[in-house]
Amino acid sequence: MRPLKYLSILILPIVVYISFTSKGLLTHLPAIVFFFLLPLLELFIKPNKENLTKEEEKTEKENKIYTYILYGTLPVQIGFLGFFFYVIQEVGLTNTELVGRVFGMGIMCSIIGINVGHELGHRNNRINEFIGEILLLTSLNTHFLPYHNGGHHLNVATPKDAATARKNEIIFLFWIRSHFTSYIQAWKIENNRLKNSGRSSFHYQNRMITYTICNLLLIGGIYFFYGQFVMISFLSAAITGIILLETCLLYTSDAADDSDC
């Protein structure tokens, strides 16, 4: 039964598909479902407060279906990204319909691109990590892995953590500070990692060099094959995904008690 609940992630591409193939109010269906209907539904559903037993936890960890479901999000995300490049060019779309479709893709960038990419990036397996990297690339947030694993977990809830909100910090300032500071710190983490292993910061194993080049190649490739409008639409969707992530970080992190926060 639990794997079936895990498949509820498929609600997202179904709803976004309706947005991509509709006009009018339905183009905003992803926002309506995930920011209104589901939160409203949660008010009437009692949460399950029971934890798994140790035996159940061991059994679930050995069940590969969960990993396969995560793997399955990769072709879904890439497929919808390609579909997005096509439907965003549809003739006759109003500005509000364009916003609805961009926001729908942005939700996919956040939930599948960043969230699932983050989960796979935590695993000590190169295949899992690579799939996570590709998913994060679709959201232009590849620096998330080195920073999150090498910085956030080490410094969470302290002034050193870019992703920890400062006391009374304005949300718009948090978006900017958290994202760009974590990007800079990701470079520092990679440089220190290579330095400690006796390698130059410009070594080919510097993930931030690879990630930055891949981000630029993706943006440039979209511009070359689809044009400026599609590129801007993709950037808008990716930024939407990043903002949704940063907003979650803001409201789930505790402000550090340090006087500088």
Regions found by a protein language model. Name each.
Residues 95-100, 108, 112-136:
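Membrane-interface helix-loop-helix junctions at boundaries between adjacent transmembrane segments
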Residues 32-50, 110-113:
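Central hydrophobic cores of alpha-helical transmembrane segments in multi-pass inner-membrane proteins
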Residues 9-12, 73-81, 210-219:
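Core segments of transmembrane alpha-helices
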Residues 251-258:
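Conserved small/polar residues in nucleotide/adenosyl-binding loops
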Residues 127-194, 259:
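Membrane-proximal soluble regions of multi-pass membrane proteins
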Residues 15-28:
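Short, hydrophobic transmembrane alpha-helix segments
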Residues 54-73:
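Juxtamembrane helix-capping/reentrant segments at transmembrane boundaries
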Residues 46-51, 79-96, 116-119:
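Transmembrane alpha-helix boundary signature
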